[in-house]
């Protein structure tokens, strides 16, 4: 669709990808990276605009999986620097998420304590900065 729009002269310079995913079902990070690359080859800028990773019954093991999913999604963006120019979570704390506290989708819990996902995102960014 975007390729066709560009071919018809539609003035489009970028696309936002919503990433509302779950620890029980998330996209392959290599497929996400490939999609970002493909969009870049069309001359489009990409932004991941709404990242959250639902985690119902989020015990320690599931929080670690949630952290891994966040890290892989962010890495897919960072691996396409110059194309993927933004990575945003769809909120800050599980207390105020549009999905409800019970699915704990964000980087901070309902008490604003940092979750493993926060530290994974930080580590991924720090590794890129090295």
Please describe what each predicted stretch is.
Residues 14-18, 47-50:
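Short, conserved beta-strand edge motifs with alternating hydrophobic and charged residues
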């Amino acid at each position: 669709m975007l390729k066709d729009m560009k071919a018809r002269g539609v003035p489009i310079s970028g696309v936002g990808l919503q990433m509302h995913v779950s620890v029980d079902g998330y996209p392959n990070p290599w497929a996400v990276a490939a999609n970002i690359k493909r969009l870049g080859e069309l001359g489009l800028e990409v932004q991941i605009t709404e990242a959250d990773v639902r985690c119902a019954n989020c015990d320690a093991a599931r929080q670690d999986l949630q952290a891994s999913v966040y890290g892989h999604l962010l890495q897919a963006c960072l691996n396409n620097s110059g194309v993927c120019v933004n990575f945003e979570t769809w909120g800050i704390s599980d207390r105020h998420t549009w999905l409800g506290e019970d699915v704990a989708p964000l980087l901070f819990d309902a008490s604003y304590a940092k979750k493993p996902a926060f530290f994974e995102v930080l580590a991924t960014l720090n590794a890129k900065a090295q």
